[in-house]
Design a protein with these regions (language model features):
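Rossmann-like NAD(P)(H) cofactor-binding subdomain of soluble oxidoreductases
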Residues: 3, 11-87
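Internal alpha-helical scaffold of NAD(P)-dependent oxidoreductase catalytic cores
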Residues: 57-68, 84-121, 131-172
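Small-residue helix-packing motif on alpha-helices
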Residues: 15, 31, 149-156, 178, ...
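Short acidic-hydrophobic, aromatic-tinged amphipathic segments that line or gate anion-handling sites
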Residues: 7-12, 111-113
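NAD(P)-dependent Rossmann-like dehydrogenase/reductase catalytic/cofactor-binding core
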Residues: 158-213
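Alpha-helical membrane segments and immediately flanking helix-loop junctions
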Residues: 124
Length: 213
């Protein structure tokens, strides 16, 4: 076998039987029939990747509602091992929490948060990645209009975003601190920032995030 110790099956029941950890990565509307079919045991750990399905709802679908449960919300950057993955836990202990966080940290950054913060955090991470890409798209259009080739413009913007993220992550600084370093009096950057604000940039971002909650 190419991957010794790994079994593949088309049967959900067969896959879950005897498993220590069961990961349910199905659409929310499939969750109830799949859960009813599985009849998970209290000693198993359930991980749900279905958005919008609360622990309370999951508890209704399982035979043992006291079982350890995790809700996981990754974003599409998981395909590049750069996901910002949100994790909420119920009926778990420290050892289980640490194991799950370590497991999914292989695919990016993980953060354990209370379940009641999941909706707000999802707006920033899962939805937010689309808003960042929308900025990339708009900036590319500006670059093309100013005479740059599309591929060059995209590379410039993507690397600039990567660098901006590194500045605040590696130095633990606030974005405003890094912005101040670039905005010299009467310079081109402050003119551009003022133009963004005159056109409601900050307000639009806040409204988009709140609309996605």
């Amino acid at each position: 076998k190419e991957f010794p110790g790994i079994s593949i099956t088309n049967s959900n029941v067969e896959a879950a039987t005897g498993a220590d950890i069961v990961i349910l990565a199905v659409k929310p509307w499939f969750m109830e029939p799949v859960m009813r079919e599985l009849k998970l045991k209290s000693k198993q750990i359930l991980i749900s990747v279905a958005a919008g399905i609360s622990f309370e709802e999951l508890a209704h679908y399982v035979v043992a509602p006291e079982m350890a449960m995790f809700r996981l919300i990754p974003n599409t950057a998981i395909s590049e091992l750069e996901s910002m993955t949100l994790v909420a836990a119920r009926n778990t202990n420290d050892e289980q929490d640490k194991f799950i966080l370590r497991l999914f940290s292989e695919m990016g950054t993980v953060m354990l948060i209370p379940e009641d913060k999941i909706a707000a955090a999802t707006a920033l991470t899962s939805c937010g990645i689309a808003y960042v890409l929308k900025y990339v798209q708009a900036a590319m259009q500006a670059g093309i209009e100013m005479g740059l080739r599309p591929k060059d413009a995209m590379q410039m913007i993507a690397q600039s975003l990567k660098g901006a993220a590194a500045l605040i992550q590696n130095n633990d600084t606030h974005p405003s601190v890094e912005i101040d370093k670039v905005t010299t009096p009467g310079g081109i950057t402050i003119k551009g920032i003022n133009e963004l604000e005159h056109n409601g940039f900050t307000s639009a971002i806040i409204k988009a995030m709140k609309a996605s909650k």
